[in-house]
Amino acid sequence: MSWQAYVDDHLMCDIEGHEDHRLTAAAIVGHDGSVWAQSATFPQFKPEEMNGIMTDFNEPGHLAPTGLHLGGTKYMVIQGEAGAVIRGKKGSGGITIKKTGQALVFGIYEEPVTPGQCNMVVERLGDYLVEQGM
């Protein structure tokens, strides 16, 4: 399966039990910041934004004072899982990022999608990739 198929079929899909509820944007990005696959709506990000995200995975709490920035959008960092998941909130939407051995799985959402639904979609694919050694 191509990386693009993972984004299209497992991240940008209808959320279980809620037709027409899906993430706003999603991507799989290597730890080096190279995009493996992304939705058409995923924001163009700056290298320093990706560096900040990677630093937060290695030093949990790094982004808390400044917020998480992606594509020029600032998210308030909320409770995640140290070294494994970063979650952010902005207005009625937010972001979930799951770290795997080689990649970061991104999901961005707006209402009516809930934070829990975004977490489920992103973390399910991330956990699968971890199990596959990715």
Swiss-Prot record:
GO cellular component: cell cortex; cytoskeleton
A Pfam family reported for this protein in Swiss-Prot or TrEMBL: Profilin
Protein modification: Phosphorylated by MAP kinases.
List of residues that carry Phosphothreonine: T114
One of the record's GO molecular function terms: actin monomer binding
InterPro entries from the UniProt entry: PFN, PFN_euk, PFN_sf, Profilin_CS
Intrachain S-S bonds: C13-C118
UniProt-annotated location(s): Cytoplasm, Cytoskeleton
PROSITE patterns tied to this protein: PROFILIN (PS00414)
Motif interval(s): Involved in PIP2 interaction: 84-100
SMART domains: PROF
Keywords recorded for this protein, A-Z: Actin-binding, Allergen, Cytoplasm, Cytoskeleton, Disulfide bond, Phosphoprotein
Chief place of localization: cytoplasm
Role description: Binds to actin and affects the structure of the cytoskeleton. At high concentrations, profilin prevents the polymerization of actin, whereas it enhances it at low concentrations. By binding to PIP2, it inhibits the formation of IP3 and DG.
Family: Belongs to the profilin family.
Assembly description: Occurs in many kinds of cells as a complex with monomeric actin in a 1:1 ratio.
Comment field (misc): The variability of the residues taking part of IgE-binding epitopes might be responsible of the difference in cross-reactivity among olive pollen cultivars, and between distantly related pollen species, leading to a variable range of allergy reactions among atopic patients.
Designated name of the protein: Profilin-1
Organism of origin: Olea europaea (Common olive)
